[in-house]
């Protein structure tokens, strides 16, 4: 079975084509600047990269070009579209309706469109991608895998906000959490690496990219996570503020006369590491500047690391202990400095890291010492593989929903 995994952003389509026999990635790529001048497709087969510059006015044209490229005699990997057994879609927000990966039909599409208001930036392009595939490959089943689904196991004490209860009853304002597919993959993989039973295992997973979140996973279920009603809550991120006093928003509007749209833009695109450092949202730039003596970069790093450590401490308490802590995503996988400084806060847990192992790059590994009471791991995330696995299981089994917990 060969599965096409699709992740549609507002002006991009990211894809992987995976042969599930051996779970081999046959090709992958990115259609970028979709609907914008200068659109192009970057297509990779093994180590070979091919760039196709071609106008793509919308997601349908982008997906059509991707399918044409898969069929290309020179750089393609299939001879006929019938070789595509199914398409798995990343969908950012499944609301409370979807706590599972699901076979997409008319009813599912209706629910997705009804919940656009919960993810107005992310769900519309996800929906456009699904509709385009349904048109281009009408006989091929489509499966939706939701970023929020894994966190639907959270108890009410974790997902409810202390607002008047009617805000939840009427408007479903609550913590949803995101990056669920990543947290699910790396937590399971950590249990495998350590030879532990996933369903008798307490793990804290740190997905640290430009967007960042932490999850507390006990016995295979997410019991809490740092992102909330939107991906703005929680950790200090590349350009997002994370946790702040909500009254600051009111102050910015009333006392500083900043329009609500600009407040939203400031909190999402001008804050975080970028706002604190006045320099960059890229942690590599921040670390280089901090090492060169830039005090604002040093401060941004300190605040970023401190917030991560605070959440780890809180989630250790929430689970009454922790067996392992996992670092993943761009910063989590590639910044020895961030990992080391976070772990420096965790001596009270008996955390000890091997600095030589920690300083290695790009390899899945345990970086804690043998006598560390908590295992520290680096696990590169693989959300596309999770989507492909769920898609395969649903299509092969003939089921509509794949329960995650």
Swiss-Prot record:
The keyword Transmembrane does not apply. Its cofactor is Mg(2+); Mn(2+). Pathway: Metabolic intermediate biosynthesis; acetyl-CoA biosynthesis; acetyl-CoA from acetate: step 1/2. The active site is at residue 147. Pfam families: Acetate_kinase (PF00871). Its main location: cytoplasm. InterPro entries: Ac/propionate_kinase, Aliphatic_acid_kin_short-chain, Aliphatic_acid_kinase_CS, ATPase_NBD. Mg(2+). Can also accept Mn(2+). It is found in: Cytoplasm. The keyword Cytoplasm applies. This is Acetate kinase. The lineage of its organism: Bacteria, Thermotogati, Thermotogota, Thermotogae, Thermotogales.
